[in-house]
Amino acid sequence: FLLCIIILRKVFSMATIKDYLNYYKDTSFNEYAFNELDNILFSELSYINWENIVSNYSSKIRLDHAINIFLGSLNDSTREGLSPFMKSNVENLKIIQNSNRYQNCFLANFRNQVDEEKQFGALCIYFNDGDVYVGFKGTDSTLVGWKEDLALAYTFPTLAQKDAINYLNEVIGWKDNTVYVGGHSKGGNLAMCAYMYSNNKVKRKVKKVFNNDGPGFRDTEYNSFQYKEMLGKLVMFVPEDSIVGVLLNSPPSFKVIKSTFNGPYEHDCNSWECFGSFFVEGRLGTLSKKFKERVDDIVNSYDDKKKEELVDTFFTILQKAGIKSFNNVSSIEWNQVLEIIKGITGIDNTTRDLFLDVFKSFINFQNKDKK
């Protein structure tokens, strides 16, 4: 029997979320309970632009109907402009749309706000006759989104964190039975923060908080009563070469997941390997450990004011070079390169090297998608 299990694990070790979708598409939540892979799928729904499809308030629309409208709104141009992660999410929508498992899911309370100071998105997914998954959107390609991510190292709460707390308190009502709160990337941090500072009525309804490769907190929040109280409900996943999920202070224990991708690209949760309704566990890689050490050295070397100055400098350099989004770094022109070189000349060596590493990874990621 043990040999059979080992063989099956070997055969199915390369399965991903898409395989899970296809295999369990005709299995209801009563037959096969909500699990960690459903959590990933629901967290991905918060990335979709449901503008003019899903209500900003409590009025609900069936998930399959919303998907049908959204897919009908896409054209070749909008599809081409999607990141690899979002292209995979759209492919998942096509399977979900025709899946009996998700036929009785409903969407409501859609939020998507981007301005000069913050990037915030959220969505409620209602399922299983009274249960709800509150999903928080992760970082998009905008500079403001990434700047707010880095602000986690010196500010609490950020504007997005404030919105997340208010949102969770607002959308959960007496009719909701079991509540799950989760998100991918920055959305995972927002999920933790929202639960930590939600009111007691909401906390009593929340069964689990999912952080899917999202960053942690500063020392102050990490050592707080609110954080320690949350740990009993927290489930955190990071891939073996995690970059985002190991930023700042992580919980004492988390699950490390194998991926079909390598390096920073493992952040794409569509690449995470699964076996049935469980992720295939691995070990934290050298890349992840070394990256965390470098970032921790910088974070611990400066006070909050200095860290804020460094982040402002980082994004001022990019803005002066005419870069408005990380989507266009692959087509950067020579005069923009010169502007960046000019901007980083006065930065200390350690910070400059980190800047170049991060910037290079974005260029490589965009080039990878074009091949």
Which residues does each predicted region cover?
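Short glycine-enriched nucleophile-adjacent loop
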Residues: 191-200
